[in-house]
């Protein structure tokens, strides 16, 4: 095991502070509508130009191991806030820096860090409660668009497209972001249920020009196992042929004799049929097949449910007005499922979303929910160059997260003003003498986002903060984009409450941990030993004993 280097107390806190400042100073220049750009070198390809705090934070790695620990802890603040709320990463970094900077001065002066930590925790709890009181639900599409515009660094096109997407698919719909082929950023809404499995054979295609199989008013067979034997399928195919309706087969796999027979009958015109693989894997596949069955009013054919393929009749099949299948996707529109059954299924999935602890599972459950209720919207992001495309796509994803957060927990006035207004809740709070310092640190730190926004815009930060503080109007603040003092909610400068709350909670959590740190342990750098000088071919004597 390599030997370690350990530093204690003030020396440790100074190293952390230096790391925190290095990272935060690089990140905070991006804050606000007049935030500056940061250019990041890439080992290959062109450099990345960004105004996104978390992108800058993720790139920073410091040479000094102890300073790097401080930087990495603040990076954690940015990443966590981005994961939870999708935005507010720069604000969280600014808050963490301010809390730690002020706190470390007090600890250096001999105050008890544990009392300061308790004070910070109490203050943050009160401020979060006050932010929730200040919060208002998003009323209309316009407000949702404004949240998107701010999060996308002032890009109106992005904000409006996201608001339109949310209106079309509802707040539980799935909105995905893809790269477009052209320069335009467009919105495409898929009605009904779509899953990422295409036709098993191109011979099923009905529209040769677009390479799509369209089935109108079709039956749907939902089978969880492979179908390879034709004789199991024959009784059902005879019933389908008599009914004259198209059939879609969704199964784990359709292969061999069964697939060949379907293709031959399709080409002869005896049957109008198509087959696709079931979506998902393992247990998730079973759940998705159940979803399709409920949406279309059919039954999932599974032996464990006592249903065999040869016993299936038309009443066991699902129905849909229209089915469209291309080589990658299948879309089922207007399924014949009972409304009550679909609602019961939706309720079950919602309960699972509440219970799950895995982000991945939650995302997949959310997708299933959207397919049953709302639909799916795809935002195709267009740009002129690869670099611009990456940057724009990241902004769209940020804005999408922020608008979701706004719909979830409501909005507060933006531009760092909500924090200033929430500070009044700390007046008259009864705490011990040591904890009072923690309250004061939070009080000072909450001015920092507004100071930084004003500073980045080229305005005098102290004057701006004092002018905003003087007003009793909750929504009155400084609009750095125009340089005006106005009602921020009316002028569209708003932040999702979830973003403001998460930024403060994550920043205070990490700042408190760093304040109560007394020692840092890191591996000693290995001393590179100089390579021994090459000694030529000497030393080859003494070989005479060899036979």
From Swiss-Prot:
Enzyme class, first EC level, given as a word = isomerase
What domain of life?
Answer: Bacteria
Entry-linked InterPro entries = Chaperonin_Cpn60_CS, Cpn60/GroEL, Cpn60/GroEL/TCP-1, GroEL-like_apical_dom_sf, GROEL-like_equatorial_sf, TCP-1-like_intermed_sf
Question: What are the recorded Gene Ontology BP terms?
Answer: protein refolding
Q: Enumerate the residues binding ATP.
A: 30-33, 51, 87-91, 415, 479-481, 495
Main location, first listed in the record: cytoplasm
* The keyword Transferase belongs to this UniProt entry's keyword annotation: no
What's a GO cellular component annotated to this UniProt protein? cytoplasm
Q: What does this protein do?
A: Together with its co-chaperonin GroES, plays an essential role in assisting protein folding. The GroEL-GroES system forms a nano-cage that allows encapsulation of the non-native substrate proteins and provides a physical environment optimized to promote and accelerate protein folding.
Q: Can you say what this protein is called?
A: Chaperonin GroEL 2
């Amino acid at each position: 095991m390599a030997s370690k280097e350990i530093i204690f107390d003030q020396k440790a806190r100074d190293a952390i502070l230096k790391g925190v400042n290095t990272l935060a100073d690089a990140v905070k220049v991006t804050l606000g509508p007049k935030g500056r750009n940061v250019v990041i070198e890439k080992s290959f390809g062109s450099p990345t130009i960004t105004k996104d705090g978390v992108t800058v934070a993720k790139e920073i790695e410091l040479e000094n191991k102890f300073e790097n620990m401080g930087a990495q802890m603040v990076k954690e603040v940015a990443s966590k806030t981005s994961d939870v709320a999708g935005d507010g990463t720069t604000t969280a970094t600014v808050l963490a820096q301010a809390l730690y900077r002020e706190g470390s001065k007090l600890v250096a002066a001999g105050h008890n860090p544990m009392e300061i930590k308790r004070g910070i925790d109490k203050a943050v709890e009160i401020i979060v409660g006050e932010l929730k009181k200040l919060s208002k639900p998003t009323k209309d599409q316009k407000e949702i668009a404004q949240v998107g515009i701010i999060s996308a660094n002032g890009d109106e096109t992005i904000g409006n497209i996201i608001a339109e997407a949310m209106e079309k698919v509802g707040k539980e719909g799935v909105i995905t972001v893809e790269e477009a082929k052209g320069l335009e950023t467009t919105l495409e809404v898929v009605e009904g249920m779509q899953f990422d499995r295409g036709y098993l054979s191109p011979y099923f295609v009905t529209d040769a020009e677009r390479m799509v199989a369209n089935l109108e008013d079709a039956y749907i067979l939902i089978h969880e196992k492979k179908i390879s034997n034709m004789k199991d399928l024959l009784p059902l195919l005879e019933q389908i042929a008599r009914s004259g309706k198209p059939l879609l087969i969704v199964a784990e796999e359709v292969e061999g004799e069964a697939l060949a027979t379907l293709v031959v009958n399709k080409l002869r015109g005896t049957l109008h049929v198509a087959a696709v693989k079931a979506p998902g894997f393992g247990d998730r596949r079973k759940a998705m097949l159940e979803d399709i069955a409920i949406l279309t009013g059919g039954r999932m054919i599974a032996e464990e449910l006592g249903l065999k393929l040869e016993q299936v009749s038309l009443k066991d099949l699902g129905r849909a007005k229209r089915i469209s299948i291309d080589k990658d996707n299948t879309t089922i529109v207007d399924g014949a499922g009972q409304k009550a059954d679909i609602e019961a299924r939706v309720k079950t999935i919602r309960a699972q979303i509440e219970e799950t602890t895995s982000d991945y599972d939650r995302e997949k459950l959310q997708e299933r929910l959207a397919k049953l209720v709302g639909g799916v919207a795809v935002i195709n992001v267009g740009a002129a160059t690869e670099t611009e495309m990456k940057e724009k796509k990241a902004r769209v994803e940020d804005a999408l997260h922020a608008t979701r957060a706004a719909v979830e927990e409501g909005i507060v006035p933006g531009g760092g003003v909500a924090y200033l207004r929430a500070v009044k809740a700390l007046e008259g709070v009864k705490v011990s003498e040591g904890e009072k310092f923690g309250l004061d640190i939070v009080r000072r730190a909450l001015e920092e986002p507004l100071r930084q926004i004003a500073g980045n815009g080229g305005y005098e930060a102290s004057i701006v903060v004092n002018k905003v503080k003087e007003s009793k109007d909750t929504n009155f603040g400084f609009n750095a984009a125009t340089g005006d003092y106005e009602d921020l909610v009316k002028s569209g400068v708003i932040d999702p409450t979830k973003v403001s709350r998460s930024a403060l909670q994550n920043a205070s959590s990490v700042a408190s941990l760093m304040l109560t740190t007394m020692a840092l342990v890191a591996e000693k750098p290995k001393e590179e030993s100089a390579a021994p000088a090459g000694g030529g071919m000497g030393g080859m004597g003494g070989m005479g004993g060899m036979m």
